[in-house]
């Protein structure tokens, strides 16, 4: 549930609420119960997990196919639709938990990308969208998107994704990623990255390497994101007043069995504050 300060709706009268409108995206897949066979090669199923975001008079939400809808909050009428045209090959469960929202105080309401909607995808891209028009903000990354696979090394594309809403603090986007569970310990690492919300440039990253372990370097001496580390697939929280970011970590690969982790699960199942 979600806390609300609304006083006109209370435990006594909530039963009297009437449905005003319904919106259907059409983005779903029919088939067997997805919980029976969740592997990268199983039949693709959809799960609607998004919490709509209300900004002024517009509702924003994402679908299991990672399309983003902007709706009139009073009528449910579609204002625009953004389609990232995700690659769903070998993805077992298609879903999206929400989008991020940011207002650029350096711009006026008439300027392009004064209001930005930020969203990650199941094929590991990060998009910046104009909240008014649904068009990409071309000054962000590569014509509006950032490749989240950068620095992860060779891996099966089905094993890495980012479908929880990006967290935003100041002018930074904070984003983690999820991996395919119960497959292998040789999967992309759980790095959490911060990107400049205007340019899409990488500002910093947190690689959850356990204390005492040395980072892995490439031939040029740059640190690589260590494979198989604890990831942050869920929803990140921020506290602008304290300038803190709270990361809810999951289990280190391969999820429910820890016998092959070799100490890489130091940050597993924890809350980490950065």
Regions flagged by a language model, labelled:
Residues 1-43, 47, 77-86, 135-155, ...:
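Aromatic (tryptophan-biased) beta-strands that constitute blades/sheets of beta-rich domains
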Residues 2-4, 32-35, 64, 71-74, ...:
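Short, solvent-exposed loop/turn and secondary-structure capping segments
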Residues 11-14, 73, 131, 197, ...:
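Inter-blade boundary loops/turns of WD-repeat beta-propellers
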Residues 44-67, 92-125, 158-184, 191, ...:
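Repeat-blade elements of multi-bladed beta-propeller folds
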Residues 56, 63, 72-75, 82, ...:
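Generic hydrophobic/packing signal
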Residues 129-134, 188-202, 261-274:
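Beta-propeller blade signature
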Residues 164, 190-191, 196, 212, ...:
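Active-site cavity-forming subdomains of large catalytic enzyme subunits
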């Amino acid at each position: 549930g979600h806390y609300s300060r609304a006083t006109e709706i209370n435990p006594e009268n909530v039963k009297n609420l009437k449905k005003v409108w319904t919106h259907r995206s059409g983005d779903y897949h029919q088939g067997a119960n997805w919980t029976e066979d969740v592997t990268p090669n199983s039949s693709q199923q959809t799960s609607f997990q998004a919490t709509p975001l209300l900004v002024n008079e517009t509702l924003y939400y994402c679908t299991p196919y990672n399309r983003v809808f902007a709706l009139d909050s009073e009528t449910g009428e579609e204002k625009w639709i953004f389609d990232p045209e995700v690659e769903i090959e070998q993805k077992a469960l298609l879903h999206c938990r929400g989008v991020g929202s940011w207002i650029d105080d350096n711009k006026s309401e008439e300027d392009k990308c004064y209001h930005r909607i930020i969203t990650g995808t199941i094929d590991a891209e990060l998009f910046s969208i104009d909240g008014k028009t649904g068009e990409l903000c071309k000054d962000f990354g590569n014509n509006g998107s950032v490749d989240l696979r950068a620095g992860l090394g060779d891996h099966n594309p089905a094993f890495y994704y980012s479908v929880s809403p990006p967290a935003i603090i100041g002018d930074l986007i904070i984003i983690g990623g999820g991996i395919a569970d119960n497959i292998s310990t040789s999967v992309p690492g759980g790095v959490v990255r911060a990107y400049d919300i205007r340019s899409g440039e990488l500002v910093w990253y947190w690689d959850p390497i356990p204390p005492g372990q040395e980072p892995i370097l490439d031939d040029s001496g740059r640190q690589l994101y260590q494979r198989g580390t604890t990831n942050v697939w869920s929803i990140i929280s921020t506290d602008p007043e304290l300038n803190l970011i709270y990361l809810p970590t999951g289990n280190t690969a391969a999820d429910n069995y820890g016998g092959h982790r070799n100490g890489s699960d130091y940050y597993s199942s924890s809350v980490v504050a950065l």
